[in-house]
């Protein structure tokens, strides 16, 4: 019998949630996703030292101002790691906009343009890039404009139906609804343990997937942030799943049979009228889990971006 990972690939496109090139080679995913935390982790891998030095040299060539050099080096390093990953995966790389721009539509658009330009200067077409943005109202509005320009986006830190609906209505290419972080919140809030079937994160992604398919939205649903393989197996059939190396290894070493759980709708009905900003903010605010986890996620990505910049500053100043 094929291992569980290979069985899963029959129903779902598998994406590696890592910046570790050796892990990506091992599990042969279609795409890969990165974020500031993963870039920070990858920057500590000795084999990546040349990518860091290249980013430092490039940043120094662009500006004499240290603050600008730090920003440029961070952007260039994220792209350098993306370029290495694109040598391995046949599909796309997701590269994230600075989390500190999560409430700045114009700043997010400008950063996306810069990242795309860096990839294009390295010979990579924008069709192989997904720009990752936090699923704030401003991030969704930025994505709507970028999509109209032909720049595809991956809306991340998505914890609520309101965020998912707004993304679909904006014509976003792909969303990353989080599973494990939703489970974390509910376990802490209720003190209960959940089976994979009852897992609140699994229930959330399933309802989003069903809504998209029932209303004919083309936005890709890519479940993310998993705590165990049970969650992954319950979402077999989801358009894509982005999975970290530890769980990819567990799936590869397992022969648990997989059954497709998520199925496309048999008929499509017209969606409701589009949400207004006021509706979005109210519906999102009504979900304390989503409010807390989005804010926490943005803060934590910003903290890791800051740690990365401390390292880059030391190298730029030496």
UniProtKB/Swiss-Prot annotation:
GO cellular component terms listed in the entry, alphabetical order: cytosol
PROSITE patterns: TRANSALDOLASE_1, TRANSALDOLASE_2
InterPro entries on file: Aldolase_TIM, TAL/FSA, Transaldolase_1, Transaldolase_AS
A GO biological-process term: carbohydrate metabolic process
Reactions performed catalytically: D-sedoheptulose 7-phosphate + D-glyceraldehyde 3-phosphate = D-erythrose 4-phosphate + beta-D-fructose 6-phosphate
Active site: 132 (schiff-base intermediate with substrate)
CDD domains in UniProt: Transaldolase_TalAB
Subcellular location per the Swiss-Prot or TrEMBL entry: Cytoplasm
Superkingdom, taxonomy of origin: Bacteria
Keyword Transferase: yes
Metabolic or biological pathway, per its Swiss-Prot or TrEMBL entry: Carbohydrate degradation; pentose phosphate pathway; D-glyceraldehyde 3-phosphate and beta-D-fructose 6-phosphate from D-ribose 5-phosphate and D-xylulose 5-phosphate (non-oxidative stage): step 2/3
E.C. number: 2.2.1.2
Cross-referenced PANTHER family: TRANSALDOLASE
Similarity comment: Belongs to the transaldolase family. Type 1 subfamily.
Quaternary data: Homodimer.
Name this protein carries in UniProt: Transaldolase
Species this protein is from: Shewanella pealeana (strain ATCC 700345 / ANG-SQ1)
Lineage: Bacteria, Pseudomonadati, Pseudomonadota, Gammaproteobacteria, Alteromonadales
């Amino acid at each position: 019998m094929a291992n569980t990972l290979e069985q899963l690939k029959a129903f779902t496109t598998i994406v590696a949630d890592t910046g570790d090139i050796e892990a990506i080679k091992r599990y042969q995913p279609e795409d890969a996703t990165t974020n500031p935390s993963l870039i920070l982790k990858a920057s500590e891998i000795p084999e990546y030292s040349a990518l860091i030095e290249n980013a430092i040299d490039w940043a120094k060539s662009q500006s004499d101002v240290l603050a600008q050099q730090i920003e440029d080096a961070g952007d260039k390093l994220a792209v350098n790691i993306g370029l290495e990953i694109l040598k391995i995966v046949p599909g796309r790389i997701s590269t994230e906009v600075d989390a500190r721009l999560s409430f700045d539509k114009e700043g997010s658009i400008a950063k996306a343009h810069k990242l795309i330009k860096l990839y294009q200067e390295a010979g990579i077409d924008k069709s192989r890039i997904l720009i990752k943005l936090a699923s704030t109202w401003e991030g969704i509005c930025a994505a709507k404009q970028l999509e109209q320009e032909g720049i595809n986006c991956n809306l991340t830190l998505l914890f609520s139906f309101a965020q998912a609906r707004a993304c679909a209505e904006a014509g976003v290419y792909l969303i990353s609804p989080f599973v494990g972080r939703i489970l974390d919140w509910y376990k802490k809030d209720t003190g209960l343990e959940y089976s994979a079937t009852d897992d609140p994160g699994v229930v959330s992604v399933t309802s989003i997937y069903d809504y998209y398919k029932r209303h004919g939205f083309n936005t890709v649903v890519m479940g993310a942030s998993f705590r165990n393989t049970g969650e992954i197996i319950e979402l077999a059939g989801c358009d894509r799943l982005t999975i970290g190396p530890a769980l990819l290894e567990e799936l590869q070493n397992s022969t648990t049979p997989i059954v497709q759980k998520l199925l496309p709708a048999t008929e499509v009905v017209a969606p409701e009228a589009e949400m207004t900003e006021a509706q979005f903010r109210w519906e999102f605010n009504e979900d304390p889990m989503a409010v807390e986890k989005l804010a926490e996620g943005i803060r934590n990505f910003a903290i890791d971006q800051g740690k990365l910049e401390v390292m880059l500053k030391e190298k730029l100043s030496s």
